Amino acid sequence: MSGLQSHILNESIGESREIKEYNALPEITLESLKERLQRDCNEPITSLGQFPDPLLFKGMKEALDIFIWAVSNNKRILCILDSDCDGVGTFITSIEFFKYFGYQNVEFLIVKRHEGYGFIPKHITDRQIKPDVIITADNGITAHAATELATQMGIYTIITDHHQPNYKGVPKASAVIDPHQPGCTFPFKDINGTVVVWYFYWAIAQRLNLNFKNHWYEMMAPELTLTTIADVIKLQGLSRFLVKDGLKKFYTSSRNWVKVFMEDRKEVDAEALAFGLIPCINVAARLADATHAANFLVSPTYQIAKEWYKYLKQLNDHRKEKQELLDKEISNTYPAWLEHPFI
């Protein structure tokens, strides 16, 4: 019996200028710009204690009921994760959660780029052993066909995502956790997939009356920061705190990938991550396999992390070389294109 099962059993802007000559534009004043700037930089969250409750997510209670039932009965869980930096972040978050609680009847699938986007029927039909529960992270909100197939096969589906539903609406899954679905009362809509699934796992611990939030945040803060920057999330409220506070964690983090990244750096900021590290993580899925980036982030030793980082940087250098050659070929073949006002 895993530890998780055991817990379950126990339960400078100048002077104001009025733009009047353009009737189609609103009047812009210095005061209105100041108000907008203040609103955009507003920090309603300044500490972990101010994080909104997980149950504010629509669908969270239903997802918790399914998860608790699954682990109570040792059901097989399949986690389906996207392959970009945010998707790999959800993978690391999921790995760390299940490892921490000792639940082993779980499998992780990072979607391969050539297969298409997100959860698809193939992820069910190609498996020799049918899962009892499927959890998606950073994908799933548009997976109508796969969700319908899972339901027909008696598989529970828990969708955790941060993208907008498409024209078909929200899939008819067993539970959907997405701040953009109609009726969701979670106050911050601009969050990424790693944050959503991190919230789901926190909610599980909260349901079990475990004092887990502080430890869970400290453990995963670098990944929450990294993926928020990678997905170019608007920095307001929760996401702003995650980046501002999370960057500080890079100086004290015990994560091996963080130590390697910080090896030759006296300081780290969002730009360093956006242009120094994130392209190296994203390139894995584009030119090789997203699991290579995942291996870097979960490296058990500093030396292994260093080797993976070296490999990813070389892969990204190769991508840049290919891009330069492609740009040169296009400029030689279609020189007029480069003068086009929209290129």
Regions found by a protein language model. Name each.
Residues 135, 156-160, 175-177, 224:
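Hydrophobic/aromatic beta-strand patches that form the interior of the parallel beta-sheet core
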Residues 122, 162-172:
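Short, glycine/polar-rich helix-capping loops at beta-to-alpha or helix-loop-helix junctions
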Residues 82-83, 111-113, 139-140, 162-165, ...:
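Short, ordered loop/turn segments at secondary-structure junctions
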Residues 7-133, 153, 206-343:
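Hydrophobic helix-and-loop "lid/oligomerization" segment in the mid-to-C-terminal part
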Residues 137-149:
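Phosphate/diphosphate-binding loops
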Residues 93, 169-211, 217-230:
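Short alpha-helices
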